[in-house]
């Protein structure tokens, strides 16, 4: 009986502690400040969990979507770009491979739930170099402008308060920022360079491996995603556009093991 009372008391004390800390029951405050500061300052060795000699695996997935209403329904066109490579912190460059695919579809009342108009094709796959935010394909006639590699430093981000910075139970450790148009322009669009006629929304999300630093498990960034909804004018009407960019990072252990070797291999493939 005494043990049951003690257990109940521990639960009550836990609830009180959570309430006093500003988090609800089952919630954990994500201690994002150190890594967001590194992202703000362009400390890419920290952001990317780079190897001791400054190399880091990177994967980037981008999608650029266009939606337009026509007489026979909504026409959509989505450009998918997937890039794998290794970034060299000291030289501020990346060597890797990139693939572009394009999907088109027409949706209307007659084909609800049908994929009869859906088409997806691979446009190209090529070796790539990205240097100081500029991407160059091995075959320089190929357009690789959809490769962004843009999260090299998000100035002023650490001054913003995330709209969400708590982890609940088994949820992933993700913070998010609902950006105003002014914040989007100053923090993101100076690198993304989107041209639009109407801004609708922009959300920046950062996922961590754990909500806080511990002696056994140091926090690191797993993924950064920016999703932007906007509209642009075409023949006196506004067309819906969406752009999403996700960047994924490996662990420092992975990078120490083989990132430099892979960087050299990618570089040789690009040059040859």
Identify the residue ranges that each predicted region occupies.
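Gly/Pro-enriched, hydrophobic low-complexity segments
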Residues: 185-266
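Short helix-loop boundary/capping segments
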Residues: 137-219
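Generic short beta-strand segments
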Residues: 59-70, 99-103, 176-186, 223-231
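Extracytoplasmic/periplasmic/luminal assembly and interaction segments
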Residues: 62-90
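N-terminal leader/targeting segments and the immediate start of mature chains
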Residues: 21-66, 267-272
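Flexible, membrane-facing loop/turn or short amphipathic-helix motifs
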Residues: 65-76, 106-112, 183-196, 230-237
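An acidic-aromatic
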Residues: 81-141
């Amino acid at each position: 009986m005494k043990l049951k009372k003690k257990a109940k008391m521990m639960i009550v004390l836990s609830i009180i502690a959570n309430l006093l800390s500003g988090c609800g029951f089952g919630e954990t405050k994500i201690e994002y400040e150190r890594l967001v500061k590194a992202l703000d300052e362009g400390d890419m060795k920290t952001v990317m969990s780079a190897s001791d000699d400054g190399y880091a695996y990177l994967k980037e997935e981008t999608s650029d979507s266009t939606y337009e209403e026509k007489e026979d329904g909504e026409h959509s066109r989505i450009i998918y770009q997937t890039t794998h490579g290794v970034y060299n912190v000291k030289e501020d460059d990346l060597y890797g491979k990139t693939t572009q695919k394009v999907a088109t579809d027409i949706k209307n009342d007659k084909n609800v739930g049908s994929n009869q108009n859906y088409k997806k094709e691979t446009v190209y796959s090529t070796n790539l170099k990205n240097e100081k935010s500029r991407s160059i394909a091995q075959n320089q006639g190929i357009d690789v402008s959809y490769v962004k590699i843009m999260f090299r430093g998000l100035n002023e981000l650490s001054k913003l308060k995330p709209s969400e910075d708590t982890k609940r139970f088994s949820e992933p450790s993700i913070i998010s920022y609902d950006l105003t148009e002014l914040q989007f322009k100053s923090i993101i669009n100076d690198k993304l360079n989107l041209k639009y006629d109407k801004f609708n929304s922009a959300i920046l999300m950062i996922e961590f491996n754990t909500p806080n630093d511990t002696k056994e498990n140091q926090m690191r960034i797993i993924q950064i995603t920016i999703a932007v909804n906007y509209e642009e004018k075409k023949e006196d009407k506004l067309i819906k556009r969406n752009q999403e960019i996700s960047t994924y990072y490996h662990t420092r252990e992975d990078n120490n093991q083989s990132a430099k070797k892979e960087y050299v291999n990618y570089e040789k493939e690009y040059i040859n």
